[in-house]
């Protein structure tokens, strides 16, 4: 991953990145879990799981934080910041610093939804839609596997040569308590690896008004 995202960005692109709001994905996840445990329990299930149209942005922000936090802890082994951006072909950007040099990685976020939400969507449908992207030098695609992981074949993707993206990763939950998560990738490599990580714990820092 580090080798594929270490190219310097142009001054114009860097200025655009500097104007984004960068946040710590770990703190985003801690704040959300605190809200979930203390305020959301009595609400409708669609609201609790952020499955309404109005809450879609929140759900995607949480997924972006989950993926970025896992990558920071298990793959990059260095702190990562994340910023929302829906320009071009990506939903958010990860940023980290190694030896005083800034690295950026644009990420397109996809989801294989739960069977009770949309059982008709299969992973092959998502693979087919990925063919439209052209970011072989820097674009990373992350697919959230929101189904029972025991019944999902992590090695089901075969037509790697048809994609013009830099990397392809899966991530998802490993237990009902949502305390254990995994990353799997890059799927475009010959030997993808699985990385397991725990949902972060800590003190919330938001203020309700």
Model-found features: residue ranges?
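Charged, structured surface patches that assemble and position nucleic-acid processing machinery
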Residues: 1-83, 112-209
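Long amphipathic N-terminal alpha/beta scaffold segment
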Residues: 75-101
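A broad, low-specificity signal for short, low-complexity segments enriched in glycine/proline
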Residues: 52-55, 101-107
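Conserved catalytic cores of phosphodiester-cleaving nucleases, focusing on short active-site segments
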Residues: 92-94, 105-113
């Amino acid at each position: 991953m580090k080798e594929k995202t270490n190219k310097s960005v142009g001054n114009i692109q860097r200025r655009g990145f500097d104007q984004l709001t960068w946040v710590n994905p770990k703190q985003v996840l801690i704040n959300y879990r605190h809200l979930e445990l203390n305020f959301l329990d009595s609400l409708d299930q669609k609201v609790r799981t952020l499955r309404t149209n109005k809450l879609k942005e929140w759900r995607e922000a949480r997924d972006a934080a989950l993926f970025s936090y896992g990558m920071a802890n298990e793959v990059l082994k260095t702190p990562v910041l994340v910023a929302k951006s829906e320009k071009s072909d990506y939903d958010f950007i990860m940023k980290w610093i190694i030896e005083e040099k800034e690295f950026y990685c644009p990420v397109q976020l996809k989801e294989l939804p739960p069977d009770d939400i949309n059982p008709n969507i299969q992973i092959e449908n998502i693979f087919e839609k990925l063919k439209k992207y052209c970011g072989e030098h820097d674009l990373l695609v992350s697919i959230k596997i929101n189904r029972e992981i025991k019944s999902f074949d992590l090695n089901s993707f075969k037509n790697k040569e048809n994609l013009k993206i830099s990397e392809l990763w899966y991530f998802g939950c490993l237990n009902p308590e949502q305390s254990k998560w995994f990353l799997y990738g890059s799927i475009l490599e010959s030997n993808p690896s699985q990385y397991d990580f725990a949902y972060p714990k800590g003190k919330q820092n938001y203020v309700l008004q």
